[in-house]
Each structure stands twice: as structure tokens, then as C-alpha cells.
UniProtKB/Swiss-Prot annotation:
Residues carrying Serine amide: 81
Database matches in InterPro entries: Penaeidin (IPR009226)
Naturally occurring in which organism (per UniProt): Penaeus vannamei (Whiteleg shrimp)
Keywords: Amidation, Antibiotic, Antimicrobial, Chitin-binding, Disulfide bond, Fungicide, Pyrrolidone carboxylic acid, Signal
Family statement: Belongs to the penaeidin family.
Modified residues (Pyrrolidone carboxylic acid): 20
Protein name, UniProt field: Penaeidin-3f
GO molecular-function terms, A-Z: chitin binding
Subcellular location: Cytoplasmic granule
Length: 82
């Protein structure tokens, strides 16, 4: 009897959740960019290692490369760490 009551509860809960999802137009989670690399606009490139002197003016892929190769990672509003 408990099993039947539990199954009825779960089935009704699933139907309610499906209705909420459909009403809200929810499709899937929104992907977020990695928190360690967020390039900011404007800035020079360092002469020897190919990584910028500051986090400004570099592409996302260049910032990720500098972070993985040299441990110099850009943080929003803080510049480099490491």
C-alpha cells in the first residue's frame, strides 16, 4: 500500500514538474564560460612569451592558452594571477 501511495505521489509530482517546465519555456541549462579567463578590451602583447602584459585586448583562446601554458590567468576586474 505504501508503494502504491509513493508511486502515485511521484507520478503526480512528475506531471506538475512537466507542466511547469513547459509553461516556463525551459529547454536546457545556460552554459557559462570558464571563470578563469575573461579577456578585457585593449592592451599590448608581451615580446617573449606571446602573452599580453595585461589582460586587456586579447581573445578568449589566447587568454586560455596563457593560463594553461604559463599559469598566467585573467580574472575579471583583477588582471593576472599566478
Amino acid at each position: 500500500m505504501r508503494l502504491v501511495a509513493c508511486l502515485v505521489f511521484l507520478a503526480s509530482f512528475a506531471l506538475v514538474c512537466q507542466g511547469q517546465v513547459y509553461k516556463g519555456g525551459y529547454t536546457r541549462p545556460i552554459p557559462r564560460p570558464p571563470p578563469f579567463v575573461r579577456p578585457l578590451p585593449g592592451g599590448p602583447i608581451g615580446p617573449y612569451n606571446g602573452c599580453p602584459i595585461s589582460c586587456r585586448g586579447i581573445s578568449f583562446s589566447q587568454a586560455r592558452s596563457c593560463c594553461s601554458r604559463l599559469g598566467r590567468c585573467c580574472h575579471v576586474g583583477k588582471g593576472y594571477s599566478g
